[in-house]
Protein backbone atom coordinates (compact mmCIF):
# COMPACT_ATOMS: atom_id res chain seq x y z
CA UNK A 1 0.00 0.00 0.00
CA UNK A 2 1.35 3.48 -0.84
CA UNK A 3 2.13 5.65 2.16
CA UNK A 4 -0.44 8.29 3.09
CA UNK A 5 0.01 11.30 0.86
CA UNK A 6 1.85 9.26 -1.78
CA UNK A 7 0.50 9.50 -5.33
CA UNK A 8 0.69 6.58 -7.73
CA UNK A 9 1.71 6.94 -11.35
CA UNK A 10 -1.92 6.31 -12.36
CA UNK A 11 -3.15 9.13 -10.14
CA UNK A 12 -0.58 11.53 -11.53
CA UNK A 13 -1.43 10.55 -15.10
CA UNK A 14 -5.13 11.10 -14.38
CA UNK A 15 -4.28 14.54 -13.01
CA UNK A 16 -2.10 15.33 -16.03
CA UNK A 17 -5.01 14.54 -18.34
CA UNK A 18 -6.72 17.68 -17.03
CA UNK A 19 -3.67 19.95 -17.36
CA UNK A 20 -2.42 21.80 -20.40
CA UNK A 21 1.18 20.60 -20.29
CA UNK A 22 0.76 18.18 -23.19
CA UNK A 23 -0.68 20.87 -25.43
CA UNK A 24 2.16 23.24 -24.54
CA UNK A 25 4.74 20.54 -25.34
CA UNK A 26 3.11 19.69 -28.69
CA UNK A 27 2.95 23.35 -29.64
CA UNK A 28 6.60 24.03 -28.82
CA UNK A 29 7.69 20.92 -30.73
CA UNK A 30 5.63 21.89 -33.78
CA UNK A 31 7.31 25.30 -33.96
CA UNK A 32 10.75 23.73 -33.46
CA UNK A 33 10.12 21.36 -36.36
CA UNK A 34 9.54 24.38 -38.59
CA UNK A 35 12.80 26.06 -37.62
CA UNK A 36 11.67 28.32 -34.78
CA UNK A 37 13.63 28.62 -31.56
CA UNK A 38 10.87 27.74 -29.09
CA UNK A 39 11.12 28.13 -25.33
CA UNK A 40 8.76 27.13 -22.51
CA UNK A 41 8.53 28.46 -18.97
CA UNK A 42 9.61 32.02 -19.78
CA UNK A 43 8.01 34.77 -17.72
CA UNK A 44 6.82 38.34 -18.11
CA UNK A 45 5.60 41.11 -15.87
CA UNK A 46 1.90 41.61 -16.53
CA UNK A 47 1.59 45.34 -17.32
CA UNK A 48 -1.94 45.45 -15.90
CA UNK A 49 -1.59 43.53 -12.65
CA UNK A 50 2.19 43.99 -12.15
CA UNK A 51 2.42 40.27 -11.36
CA UNK A 52 4.97 37.86 -12.82
CA UNK A 53 3.26 35.36 -15.10
CA UNK A 54 4.50 32.38 -17.08
CA UNK A 55 4.31 32.32 -20.87
CA UNK A 56 3.35 28.94 -22.30
CA UNK A 57 5.55 29.13 -25.42
CA UNK A 58 7.74 31.84 -26.97
CA UNK A 59 8.83 30.98 -30.51
CA UNK A 60 11.24 33.14 -32.50
CA UNK A 61 11.63 32.58 -36.20
CA UNK A 62 15.22 32.33 -37.48
CA UNK A 63 15.41 34.83 -40.34
CA UNK A 64 18.09 35.33 -42.98
CA UNK A 65 17.70 39.09 -42.58
CA UNK A 66 15.31 41.26 -40.60
CA UNK A 67 14.85 44.73 -39.12
CA UNK A 68 13.67 43.11 -35.87
CA UNK A 69 13.40 39.93 -33.86
CA UNK A 70 9.96 38.44 -34.59
CA UNK A 71 8.20 36.21 -32.08
CA UNK A 72 5.02 34.19 -31.78
CA UNK A 73 3.97 34.49 -28.12
CA UNK A 74 1.64 31.57 -27.50
CA UNK A 75 -1.09 30.90 -24.94
CA UNK A 76 -2.30 27.28 -24.83
CA UNK A 77 -5.81 26.47 -23.60
CA UNK A 78 -6.70 22.83 -22.93
CA UNK A 79 -9.91 21.40 -21.51
CA UNK A 80 -12.35 24.02 -22.74
CA UNK A 81 -15.97 23.27 -21.86
CA UNK A 82 -17.61 24.54 -25.03
CA UNK A 83 -16.69 25.35 -28.60
CA UNK A 84 -15.20 28.76 -29.30
CA UNK A 85 -17.21 31.04 -31.57
CA UNK A 86 -15.43 33.76 -33.53
CA UNK A 87 -17.74 36.63 -34.43
CA UNK A 88 -17.28 38.25 -37.82
CA UNK A 89 -18.82 41.42 -39.17
CA UNK A 90 -18.52 43.95 -41.97
CA UNK A 91 -16.27 46.75 -40.81
CA UNK A 92 -15.92 50.30 -42.14
CA UNK A 93 -13.12 51.01 -44.59
CA UNK A 94 -9.68 50.97 -42.95
CA UNK A 95 -10.84 49.15 -39.81
CA UNK A 96 -9.41 45.90 -41.15
CA UNK A 97 -5.95 47.40 -40.68
CA UNK A 98 -3.83 46.54 -37.67
CA UNK A 99 -0.25 46.62 -36.49
CA UNK A 100 1.73 43.98 -34.59
CA UNK A 101 2.79 44.52 -31.00
CA UNK A 102 6.31 45.94 -31.10
CA UNK A 103 9.02 47.76 -29.23
CA UNK A 104 8.61 51.55 -29.18
CA UNK A 105 11.04 52.33 -31.97
CA UNK A 106 9.09 50.20 -34.45
CA UNK A 107 5.58 51.46 -33.67
CA UNK A 108 5.68 54.44 -36.06
CA UNK A 109 7.14 52.64 -39.11
CA UNK A 110 4.80 49.68 -38.57
CA UNK A 111 1.84 52.07 -38.39
CA UNK A 112 2.93 53.59 -41.70
CA UNK A 113 3.05 50.12 -43.28
CA UNK A 114 -0.19 48.77 -41.74
CA UNK A 115 -1.88 48.28 -45.12
CA UNK A 116 1.13 46.22 -46.25
CA UNK A 117 1.04 44.21 -43.01
CA UNK A 118 -2.65 43.39 -43.41
CA UNK A 119 -1.86 42.08 -46.90
CA UNK A 120 1.26 40.11 -45.94
CA UNK A 121 0.03 38.44 -42.77
CA UNK A 122 -3.54 37.25 -43.41
CA UNK A 123 -4.93 34.01 -42.04
CA UNK A 124 -8.40 34.63 -43.39
CA UNK A 125 -8.69 36.25 -46.83
CA UNK A 126 -7.96 39.99 -46.36
CA UNK A 127 -11.54 41.11 -46.96
CA UNK A 128 -14.74 41.70 -45.04
CA UNK A 129 -16.32 40.26 -42.95
CA UNK A 130 -13.56 40.57 -40.35
CA UNK A 131 -13.24 38.53 -37.15
CA UNK A 132 -13.49 41.02 -34.30
CA UNK A 133 -14.41 39.05 -31.16
CA UNK A 134 -14.48 35.56 -29.65
CA UNK A 135 -16.64 33.83 -27.05
CA UNK A 136 -16.86 30.37 -25.50
CA UNK A 137 -20.25 28.84 -26.33
CA UNK A 138 -22.64 26.86 -24.14
CA UNK A 139 -21.11 27.68 -20.77
CA UNK A 140 -22.60 28.68 -17.44
CA UNK A 141 -21.43 31.63 -15.39
CA UNK A 142 -19.61 34.82 -16.28
CA UNK A 143 -16.17 33.36 -16.95
CA UNK A 144 -15.33 33.36 -20.66
CA UNK A 145 -12.18 31.35 -21.32
CA UNK A 146 -11.99 32.45 -24.96
CA UNK A 147 -12.02 36.18 -24.25
CA UNK A 148 -9.64 35.62 -21.35
CA UNK A 149 -7.21 33.77 -23.62
CA UNK A 150 -7.02 36.70 -26.05
CA UNK A 151 -6.34 39.05 -23.16
CA UNK A 152 -3.66 36.77 -21.70
CA UNK A 153 -1.93 36.27 -25.05
CA UNK A 154 -1.74 39.99 -25.85
CA UNK A 155 -0.63 40.81 -22.32
CA UNK A 156 2.10 38.17 -22.60
CA UNK A 157 3.26 39.56 -25.95
CA UNK A 158 3.51 43.08 -24.56
CA UNK A 159 5.16 41.87 -21.38
CA UNK A 160 7.70 39.81 -23.33
CA UNK A 161 8.77 42.80 -25.41
CA UNK A 162 9.32 44.91 -22.30
CA UNK A 163 12.56 42.99 -21.82
CA UNK A 164 13.71 43.36 -25.42
CA UNK A 165 17.02 45.18 -25.87
CA UNK A 166 16.75 45.27 -29.67
CA UNK A 167 13.91 46.06 -32.12
CA UNK A 168 11.28 43.33 -31.74
CA UNK A 169 7.81 42.36 -32.97
CA UNK A 170 5.41 39.91 -31.32
CA UNK A 171 2.28 38.22 -32.66
CA UNK A 172 -0.02 36.73 -29.99
CA UNK A 173 -1.26 33.20 -30.75
CA UNK A 174 -3.84 31.13 -28.86
CA UNK A 175 -3.81 27.33 -29.32
CA UNK A 176 -6.92 25.49 -28.17
CA UNK A 177 -8.09 21.87 -28.15
CA UNK A 178 -11.77 22.66 -28.71
CA UNK A 179 -13.74 23.18 -31.97
CA UNK A 180 -13.67 26.64 -33.57
CA UNK A 181 -16.59 28.19 -35.42
CA UNK A 182 -17.02 31.51 -37.17
CA UNK A 183 -20.35 33.31 -36.80
CA UNK A 184 -21.88 35.62 -39.39
CA UNK A 185 -25.47 36.56 -40.21
CA UNK A 186 -27.21 36.39 -43.57
CA UNK A 187 -29.51 39.03 -45.06
CA UNK A 188 -32.47 37.72 -43.05
CA UNK A 189 -30.59 37.83 -39.75
CA UNK A 190 -30.15 34.06 -39.57
CA UNK A 191 -26.89 32.97 -37.90
CA UNK A 192 -24.38 31.22 -40.15
CA UNK A 193 -21.84 28.96 -38.41
CA UNK A 194 -18.77 27.52 -40.15
CA UNK A 195 -16.23 25.24 -38.48
CA UNK A 196 -12.58 26.06 -39.14
CA UNK A 197 -9.08 25.22 -37.92
CA UNK A 198 -7.74 28.74 -37.40
CA UNK A 199 -8.63 32.38 -37.66
CA UNK A 200 -7.18 35.81 -37.02
CA UNK A 201 -9.13 38.02 -34.64
CA UNK A 202 -8.55 41.77 -35.04
CA UNK A 203 -9.01 42.70 -31.43
CA UNK A 204 -9.12 46.04 -29.66
CA UNK A 205 -7.43 45.57 -26.31
CA UNK A 206 -8.70 47.47 -23.28
CA UNK A 207 -6.82 50.76 -23.14
CA UNK A 208 -5.48 50.44 -26.69
CA UNK A 209 -6.73 52.36 -29.69
CA UNK A 210 -5.67 50.54 -32.85
CA UNK A 211 -6.60 46.93 -33.37
CA UNK A 212 -4.02 44.21 -33.01
CA UNK A 213 -4.21 40.66 -34.32
CA UNK A 214 -4.46 37.44 -32.33
CA UNK A 215 -4.25 34.13 -34.18
CA UNK A 216 -6.55 31.42 -32.79
CA UNK A 217 -5.52 27.92 -33.84
CA UNK A 218 -6.88 24.43 -33.15
CA UNK A 219 -4.51 21.83 -31.80
CA UNK A 220 -4.68 19.83 -35.03
CA UNK A 221 -3.56 22.84 -37.12
CA UNK A 222 -0.56 24.03 -35.09
CA UNK A 223 2.09 22.58 -37.41
CA UNK A 224 0.39 24.08 -40.47
CA UNK A 225 0.17 27.43 -38.73
CA UNK A 226 3.82 27.39 -37.69
CA UNK A 227 4.79 26.69 -41.30
CA UNK A 228 2.62 29.58 -42.49
CA UNK A 229 4.02 32.01 -39.91
CA UNK A 230 7.61 31.14 -40.75
CA UNK A 231 7.03 32.06 -44.39
CA UNK A 232 5.03 35.19 -43.61
CA UNK A 233 7.44 36.48 -40.94
CA UNK A 234 10.33 36.33 -43.42
CA UNK A 235 8.17 38.02 -46.04
CA UNK A 236 7.26 40.76 -43.55
CA UNK A 237 10.91 41.30 -42.64
CA UNK A 238 11.93 41.56 -46.30
CA UNK A 239 9.15 44.01 -47.13
CA UNK A 240 9.90 46.23 -44.14
CA UNK A 241 13.56 46.39 -45.22
CA UNK A 242 12.44 47.27 -48.76
CA UNK A 243 10.35 50.09 -47.30
CA UNK A 244 13.29 51.66 -45.51
CA UNK A 245 13.72 49.91 -42.17
CA UNK A 246 17.39 49.07 -41.60
CA UNK A 247 18.48 45.46 -41.39
CA UNK A 248 19.33 45.16 -37.72
CA UNK A 249 19.21 41.57 -36.49
CA UNK A 250 20.51 38.22 -37.61
CA UNK A 251 20.35 36.01 -34.50
CA UNK A 252 17.78 34.83 -31.99
CA UNK A 253 17.28 36.07 -28.44
CA UNK A 254 14.86 33.51 -26.95
Predicted regions span which residues?
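Intrinsically disordered, low-complexity Ser/Thr/Pro/Gly-rich regulatory segments
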Residues: 1-254
Amino acid sequence: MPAKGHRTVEEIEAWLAHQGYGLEHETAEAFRRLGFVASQGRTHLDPTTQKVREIDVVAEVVLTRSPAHIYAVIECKAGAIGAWVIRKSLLPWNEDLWIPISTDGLAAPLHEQRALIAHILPVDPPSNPIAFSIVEAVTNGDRDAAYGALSQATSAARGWLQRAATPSIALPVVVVDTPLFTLTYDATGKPQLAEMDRARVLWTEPGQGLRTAVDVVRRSAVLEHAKDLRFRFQWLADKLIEHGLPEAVSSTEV
